[in-house]
Each structure stands twice: as C-alpha cells, then as structure tokens.
From Swiss-Prot:
PANTHER family: N-(5'-PHOSPHORIBOSYL)ANTHRANILATE ISOMERASE (PTHR42894:SF1). The keyword Isomerase applies. One of its GO terms (molecular function) is phosphoribosylanthranilate isomerase activity. SUPFAM superfamilies: Ribulose-phoshate binding barrel. Belongs to the TrpF family. The keyword Isomerase applies. It comes from Paramagnetospirillum magneticum (strain ATCC 700264 / AMB-1). One of its GO terms (biological process) is L-tryptophan biosynthetic process. NCBIfam families: PRK01222.1-1. Keywords: Amino-acid biosynthesis, Aromatic amino acid biosynthesis, Isomerase, Tryptophan biosynthesis. InterPro entries: Aldolase_TIM (IPR013785), PRAI_dom (IPR001240), RibuloseP-bd_barrel (IPR011060), TrpF_fam (IPR044643). Its EC number is 5.3.1.24. It is an enzyme of class 5 (isomerase). This is N-(5'-phosphoribosyl)anthranilate isomerase.
Length: 215
C-alpha cells in the first residue's frame, strides 16, 4: 500500500489544488489563531469546496471549547478532527460523541517513554499522530520544523492507525518512513517557503518522496 500523505496548514487555493492534483489523501486546515496557518471558518469553508469527496478534510484544533467547535463545524465540512493540545482522553471521547466525527489525537514525543502516553487514548480516538515535542517556550504545538528519533516507532503497534509528523521534508520523508514504518505522514512547515506560505514544488516533491519511501 502506498504511504498516505497529509498536507497540513493549507491557507490558499493554489496549495489546495496542488495537494489534490498530486494525490494527497488528507488536507489540513488550522483553527488556532496564534498559528501563521490559521484560517477563519468562512475561509476554510471556501477552501474545502476545492477538495473532492475522496480527500479527507481535517480540522486542526488546540484544546478547543465547544463554542469554537460549534462555530467551525456549522460552517466547514470536515471529515476528521485533529486534536493537537492537551486534551484528556475524557475530552477526546466527549468531542467524538458530541460531533459524530472521527478524532485523531496528537501525541508529542521525544523518546520511547513518551509513547506510553498513547495507551489511554486507544479506546477513545480513531487515529493517533506522533509529532515532535515543540521547543521550550514555543507558542505552536506543531509546525515547528522539529523532528525526533523515528526508530522509537519501529515495530510498534497500537491497534489504531497512526501518522508520523515532525520536521518532515521532501529530503527526509523517505528515510522517516523506512525507519519508522509509518503508513501515513503529515507535513506543514516542510513544504513552505515561509511560515504559512506553501510551496507548490515542495508539495510535489514531498508527496513523490513519501510514496517512494516504503518497501
């Protein structure tokens, strides 16, 4: 099976078009105002209209309250909710039940011990995403161009699909897939020319490299 690819932090039609044309499986929209990739619900609603039905539209949230989720989900047609904050298993389950959408819980890791944090989420999330721990003092929980030791994931199984993120680029994604065994990868800053500005050539190169990176 080819590696699945998620292009996250899309803010304009050009990036959306390229991601779709090159066969991205997931496109991510960020609903977190401190991020340079943040989009308003109305803007996001416009962007998802460019994505065909077989492309999974993902909304990234950081410790969202119900009001935030209500505002976005009444305007934007999303298929998957990505929770990238400190949401507890109880909160993940509550969001999943309230909104009737699958949830991908992000876990920030730097070493093998951090993987133990996945256990409480296995019964309440639909998918996991392993991202690098943000640098100390960082405002953003992800999209920081920081990676981690991919070998800590080698041979690991959780009973849920999982995705790899954290400092991935066209130059290293094939190796990351080979070492970690990831069946899906997520990129944001690694396909940008500046924070929040996606680079079409980098998107193309990333997807091509990711798809060639798994035996």
């Amino acid at each position: 099976m080819p590696v699945e690819v998620k292009i996250c932090g899309i803010t304009d039609e050009d990036a959306m078009d390229v991601a779709i044309e090159e066969g991205a499986d997931y496109v991510g929209l960020v609903f977190f105002p401190p991020s340079p990739r943040n989009v308003t619900p109305d803007r996001a609603a416009e962007l998802v209209e460019f994505a065909p039905g077989d492309v999974t539209k993902v909304g990234l949230f950081v410790d969202p309250d119900d009001a935030t989720l209500d505002t976005v989900l009444t305007r934007v047609r999303l298929d998957l909710l990505q929770l990238h904050g400190h949401e507890t298993p109880e909160r993940v389950e509550a969001i999943r039940l309230e909104y009737g959408l699958p949830v991908m819980k992000v876990l920030s890791v730097s070493d093998a011990a951090d993987l133990d944090a996945a256990e409480p989420y296995l019964a309440v999330a639909d998918r996991l995403l392993f991202d690098a721990k943000p640098p100390k003092g960082a405002v953003l929980p992800g999209g920081n161009a920081v990676s981690f030791d991919w070998s800590i994931l080698t041979g690991r199984k959780w009973g849920l699909p999982w995705m790899l993120a954290g400092g991935l680029t066209p130059a290293n994604v094939a190796e990351a897939v080979r070492i970690s065994g990831a069946a899906a990868v997520d990129v944001s800053s690694g396909v940008e020319s500046a924070p929040g500005i996606k680079d079409s050539d980098k998107i193309r190169a990333f997807i091509k490299a990711a798809r060639g990176g798994r035996p």
